[in-house]
């Protein structure tokens, strides 16, 4: 079978307004769309998410944005990962867009991990996180990110939604390694695994040590 590529962040390249990490197809399309809108209509860009990783990605794209997390209840009608993230990204985006006055570009996103047909969101507690790590270690799983962009212009609203999927492979992990990871804490904050789909972040020390490789967009896994 075809092996997965190494999981280190992509090399940096020149792109428009400055040094930006090499982008996956979805992120590249997002950058082009947002830049064209800003150039033509000088709209403000609003990120409908409180995720620090998504804010970091926008900064990497060179796009200044206002962070305005959605407060909408997350209700989905599908059990398919790609449809779930598309539904939730659209829900978040439109929730914020409805409360936004003036011309704007609102971006909503949602990420889930899927393993053998089961959707893994953020861990509900340490036992849930432990179960996730034991399931994922030594195997390949999928990370789905859905993105919705709503463009509000002169009382008209245009909305586009898309999804990207990346395969991620973990090295085998011992029980001791899993427990060591679960014990990691951030000073004054929640445990490192608590706010991430699947209980891990590829851009963290965990990703460097335990992610064997990926097939697809690195930044899709980042969120």
Language-model-derived ranges and their functions:
Residues 2-10:
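Extreme N-terminal basic, low-complexity initiation segments
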Residues 36-37:
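Polybasic, lysine-rich low-complexity intrinsically disordered segments
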């Amino acid at each position: 079978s075809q092996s997965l590529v190494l999981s280190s962040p992509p090399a940096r390249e020149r792109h428009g307004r400055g040094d930006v990490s090499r982008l996956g197809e979805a992120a590249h399309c997002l950058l082009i769309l947002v830049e064209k809108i800003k150039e033509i209509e000088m709209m403000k860009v609003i990120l409908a998410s409180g995720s620090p990783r998504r804010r970091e990605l926008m900064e990497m794209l060179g796009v200044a944005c206002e962070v305005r997390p959605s407060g909408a209840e997350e209700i989905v009608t599908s059990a398919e990962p790609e449809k779930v993230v598309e539904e939730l990204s659209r829900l978040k985006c439109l929730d914020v867009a409805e409360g936004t006055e003036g011309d704007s570009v609102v971006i909503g996103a949602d990420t889930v991990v899927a393993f053998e047909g089961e959707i893994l969101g953020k861990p509900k507690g340490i036992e849930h996180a432990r179960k996730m790590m034991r399931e994922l270690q030594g195997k390949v799983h999928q990370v789905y990110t859905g993105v919705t962009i709503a463009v509000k212009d002169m009382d008209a609203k245009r909305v586009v939604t898309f999804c990207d999927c990346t395969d991620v492979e973990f090295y085998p992990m011992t029980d001791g390694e899993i427990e060591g990871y679960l014990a990691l804490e951030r000073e004054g904050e929640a445990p490192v695994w608590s706010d991430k789909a699947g209980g891990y972040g590829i851009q963290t020390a965990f990703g460097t040590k335990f992610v064997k490789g990926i097939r697809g967009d690195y930044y899709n896994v980042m969120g």
